[in-house]
Amino acid sequence: IIYTRNRAEFEEFFIAGFDPENPDNLLVIAHNGNDKRGLWSFDPKEKKFKELIYRRSDGDVFRTRFHSNRFTNSGDITAVSYYDGRELSYEWFNGEEKAIYDQLKSIIPYADRIGISSRSRDGNSLIISNRGPRDPGTYYLLKNGEFKVIGSTKPGLSSEHLANVEAITYEARDGRKIRGFITTPNSKPPYPLVVMPHGGPFIGENPGFNEWAQMLANRGFMVLQPQYRGSKYFGLDFYKTAFINGGQGGYQMQDDKDDGALYLVEKGLVDPNRMMMFGWSYGGYASLIAAARTPQIYQCVIAGASFPDPIMQVNYYRNRLNRSGGSTAAIEQLNMWLKSMSPLEQAAEVNIPILIVHGDVDQRTPPKAVRKYIKAL
């Protein structure tokens, strides 16, 4: 077993490696009854958690980082990562590996998501990767103290023409703190705005290099990527309130996106008369919901690979809750979502232009529902 989930409570448990203090135990990233995911020592024979090694109060432990030399220290966990604003930060357990990382961070231009792809047995040669908002992906060679560029994954893109990404925190209309990321064009405010919710919806945003955000910023748009309720890495409570525990059938998820746009207007960064929403998959669904909202704050929306009739998605979660003994209240929330948050049912209320993009052989979000929605407009 590498990964399990308590489906009724949405808790996660996955194996990261072996405990160096006791090889009979495992190192696992899990909730273990807590709101935030942490790194634990776990006894597989007794099926018991033994010790909490690291956990944060403001977010989940994200992943583990392994020793860069797989020849001499294969499988050794040297750090755990977590999101600190936009940055992917580390809690280090190995001083030597931290020193290497700090050195690389000081010499790599636009250092961001730094990885060591491979390292020689003697440790003197390293192939390093970097990726971030101002670097779509570059590989380097560090050999016997000499540092040089191997090449870029997107050589046609210049860092000087790419935009910065910053983390923001704003307050939703019910007082909940919502985090997000803004990509800012190299011009002066107020900017036209694209609200770009991630897909899923129950995943998290990786705020590194995003082709859509950078393309839009290059054309003068500010881009907001809101981490609305249901996004991962901010704890179970934040995750579950998307559709249970008072999630109000998805209304708050949509409010979180709109409130981010209004926050940027209030700050003088965005022109309220030039705002739109654009998303893919669940983000496309959210864009269709936005097109029928009242009061309307957007001038248009783009929906890619959307699901105008969410019955399949809702049935998936309903069946999962039924199989795992989920609460009646949670299932009722899903039923309310199906009834009140269906773009197909709201087609007559659409009050702004819509651009729909959809693959005619898409299997994950079949186009049948989109064709039905277009006829209903």
Model-derived features with residue positions:
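Short glycine/acidic-enriched loop and turn motifs that connect beta-strands
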Residues: 32-36, 84-87, 132-135
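Cap/lid segment of the alpha/beta-hydrolase catalytic domain
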Residues: 154-273, 280-281, 314-315
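Hydrophobic/aromatic beta-strand patches that form the interior of the parallel beta-sheet core
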Residues: 78, 148, 168, 195, ...
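Multi-bladed beta-propeller domains
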Residues: 1-19, 42-68, 84, 89-114, ...
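Active-site-proximal cap/loop segments of hydrolase catalytic domains
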Residues: 228-377
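C-terminal substrate/ligand-recognition segments
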Residues: 128-129, 133, 172-178, 202, ...
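Conserved beta-propeller blade repeats
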Residues: 1-30, 37-39, 58-80, 110-129, ...
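Non-catalytic accessory segments flanking enzyme active sites
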Residues: 89-186, 211-214, 218-219
